[in-house]
UniProtKB/Swiss-Prot annotation:
Subcellular location: Periplasm
Signal peptide per UniProt: 1-15
UniProtKB keywords: Periplasm, Signal
Gene Ontology terms: cellular component: outer membrane-bounded periplasmic space
Gene that produces this protein: opgG
Species, as recorded: Ralstonia nicotianae (strain ATCC BAA-1114 / GMI1000)
A UniProt-annotated Pfam family: MdoG
Protein name, as recorded: Glucans biosynthesis protein G
InterPro entries according to UniProt: Gal_mutarotase_sf_dom, GH-type_carb-bd, Glucan_biosyn_MdoG/MdoD, Glucan_biosyn_MdoG_C, Ig-like_fold, Ig_E-set, MdoG_OpgG
Length: 504
């Protein structure tokens, strides 16, 4: 009899935990069949008008972390509504007892110097949440990932600090019609077991033209991994659908020094776009802060992956004690299954300072989903530092820009009317070369660039190889596209350096 009762209890628990992606997908499908309804504007004026620095004074009380009293490995903290974050999200806990909403309570927050009318706090919700896990030391639960604002989320691995963000979906980015920002409206978070090393979250996405159901399996570690599975529904056709979008910042760097005197040599969350094409070609595109909008496309079929990377890990490159740019993660998107034909698109937007995210990268399928038809996608998102995805041969470590000169001899150098680009490569393919092995730099430019000279030489300081390209611009109002790689005896030694020299 006891066995029967035990089996019945187990079956009940399993039934309660049977909540999954299909349940959220059914909600998304129902939403897509109805006209979009914008969320009501219910945030009190005094919260909406908070400056961002004032909003940050409202802090969640860490001793009120969800699951802390239960001594579970994961804990939840929450964000208050206010300032930019003017819409609530519904957050549920999924446990053997069923799905239960975690309700907002102002007593969970310390308002510091921010004075608010208590009656305006009665009917609020949470703006988002963060997840904590003992990632760096066993005794302290670090922040691992944050879901806050539209469909944004950002994560970190061991020894990292927050940098770039990911999104659930991007619609019509960089089009004249204007971008549409879908938002996660409801979350379901599975209560973890006492020995859990991963956490599962479900999310419902909604916008004027799209709905979606998402499952995130979060695995904290040296490289924090987020396994993403989603089912999307379009209410109507979209011009451009951005899958697995990443959002970052590039203000200035080694290839584009600061326009004003600054003690920091570089300021960026990412320094390049890395891509593994369906044919196995690795491509590296250094980032820039352009004078006007730049959109670049890299077409392929069944991509191996793409990401916005922070390759430069030297503190000396940034000299920023507070922001620690060298510790900011790279984010690598690795498709699960075949994504078919499409393109990785890179959008770079002018920014006057480091407070604006001005870089976006995402996958655009060649055949967009049709309205009311399910569109399934799955990928792995890695927040990395030392384990950054790189080609097995050799890779670009830096790109520097200068005026050209008339001779290689330092004592006779004179500036000329050319542009010089200096590209350094490092990696095992170069390290294994015999001392006198021939290395050929293969570099080309489009019709707007006239290459005057290409010079390659060993970089004895790094054990790699340096290539200097001197070129002239045909039309100053147009960009120049360049490509280059290293080979020896017809065999490729490096990834492909792909550079866009902006106009002017």
């Amino acid at each position: 009899m006891r066995l029967a009762v035990g089996l019945l209890a187990l079956a009940s628990a399993q039934a309660a935990l049977a909540f999954g992606l299909n349940d959220v997908a059914a909600r998304a499908k129902q939403l897509a069949a109805k006209p979009y309804q914008a969320p009501p504007d219910t945030l009190p004026h005094e919260l909406r008008e908070l400056r961002y620095d004032q909003y940050r004074e409202i802090r969640f009380k860490s001793d009120q972390a969800y699951w802390r009293r239960d001594k579970l490995p994961f804990e939840l903290g929450f964000f208050h509504e206010g300032s930019y974050y003017d819409q609530p999200v519904k957050i549920n806990e999924v446990s053997p007892a069923g799905a239960r909403e975690i309700r907002f309570d102002p007593r969970l927050f310390d308002y510091g110097p921010v004075k608010l009318d208590p009656k305006h706090l009665r009917n609020l919700g949470f703006a988002g949440f963060r997840i904590h896990y003992p990632m760096n030391t066993p005794k302290y639960k670090d922040e691992v990932i944050v879901f806050l604002g539209a469909s944004y989320f950002r994560g970190i691995g061991k020894g990292q600090v927050y940098g770039l963000s990911a999104r659930g979906l991007a619609i019509d980015t960089a089009l004249n019609s204007g971008e549409e920002f879908p938002r996660f409206t409801e979350f379901w978070i599975e209560r973890p077991a006492a020995n859990a090393k991963e956490l599962t979250i479900y999310a419902l996405l909604n916008s004027r033209r799209a709905t979606g159901a998402y499952r995130f399996v979060i695995k904290p570690g040296t490289d924090t991994e987020v396994d993403v599975k989603a089912q999307l529904y379009m209410r109507e056709n979209v011009s451009k659908l951005g899958i697995a979008p990443l959002t970052s910042m590039f203000f200035f760097g080694e290839n584009q020094p600061a326009s004003a005197l600054d003690f920091r040599p570089e300021v960026h969350d990412s320094d390049g776009l890395s891509m593994l094409s369906g044919t196995g070609e690795w491509i590296w595109r250094p980032l820039t802060n352009p004078k006007r909008l730049l959109v670049s496309s890299f077409s392929t079929t069944n991509p191996g992956g793409f990401g916005l990377m922070q390759r430069d890990r030297a503190f000396s490159s940034y000299q920023e004690i507070g922001d620690r740019y060298e510790l900011r993660p790279s984010a690598w998107v690795e498709p699960v299954g075949k994504w078919g034909a499409g393109r990785v698109e890179l959008v770079q937007i002018p920014t006057p300072d480091e407070t604006n995210d001005n870089v976006v990268a995402y996958w655009v399928p060649e055949t967009p989903p049709k309205p009311q038809q399910p569109f399934n996608l799955e990928y792995r998102l890695l927040w990395q530092k030392e384990g950054d995805k790189k080609p097995g041969l050799s890779w670009v470590t830096q790109t520097r820009r200068s005026h050209g000169w008339t001779t290689k001899r330092p004592d006779e150098r004179k500036p000329d009317d050319t542009i010089a680009l200096v590209v350094d490569f490092e990696g095992p393919a170069l390290a294994k070369l015999p001392p006198n092995a021939p290395v050929e730099p293969v570099f080309t430019a489009d019709a707007n660039g006239k290459i005057e000279s290409i010079f390659g030489q060993p970089n004895t300081a790094t054990g790699g190889w340096r290539v200097t390209v001197r070129l002239k611009r045909v039309d100053d109002d147009k960009p120049i596209e360049l490509r280059g790689y290293l080979r020896s005896g017809g065999t490729g030694l490096s990834e492909t350096w792909s550079y866009l020299l902006p106009p002017g």
